[in-house]
A protein has these predicted regions:
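Concave beta-strand-loop units of leucine-rich repeat
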Residues: 49-61, 66-79, 84-100, 105-121, ...
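N-terminal capping/linker segments that flank leucine-rich repeat
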Residues: 1-61, 144-161
Length: 161
């Protein structure tokens, strides 16, 4: 193993230790606002949520959320940016999020990614999508071909433009 890889691994492990791991929203009576108040009382740390998270029409921002273990549904919400979110283990629904301007730090989506009917103009830091990718009715669908999109990120499924 190269020294650079060892250093990256050590730094990644240190970051993991600073990550508050929340098993699921059910521990907060499935109430996003209760979770946010708890996080505020803890100094708004970086955090991850295990399992699925349904926040449709519910949020404008995700705060310091870094990872979601399962499916994340933000479809039709007022979300503007995914902020610090880096990894979604399952699929990610952002369909019809009219205020969405940025994918923030998002790098990995384990399942499909629906960006249909959004104003997203760039895939930002996105490196991988495990399922299909819907870019229909977006500025990206007019700007790039399927082949160009495939050259930008790695993924398994179909691209819908």
């Amino acid at each position: 193993m190269k020294i650079e890889n060892i250093i990256r691994k050590v730094l990644r492990e240190q970051e993991e230790k600073k990550l508050l791991k929340i098993p699921g929203l059910k521990f907060f009576n499935n109430d996003w606002n209760v979770l946010q108040k708890f996080l505020e009382s803890q100094g708004n740390p970086r955090y991850s949520i295990g399992g699925n998270l349904d926040l449709r029409a519910y949020v404008e921002e995700l705060g310091n959320l870094v990872r979601v273990g399962g499916f994340l549904d933000l479809g039709f919400s007022d979300i503007k940016s995914l902020g610090n979110l880096e990894i979604v283990g399952g699929s990610l629904n952002l369909a019809s999020c009219k205020n969405l301007q940025s994918l923030g730090d998002l790098r990995y989506v384990g399942g499909w990614l629906d960006l249909g009917s959004t104003r997203i103009e760039t895939l930002g830091n996105l490196e991988y999508v495990g399922g299909w990718l819907d870019l229909g009715r977006t500025p990206l669908s007019k700007k790039y071909t399927e082949e160009e999109i495939r050259d930008m990120i790695g993924f398994v499924g179909k691209v819908y433009l």
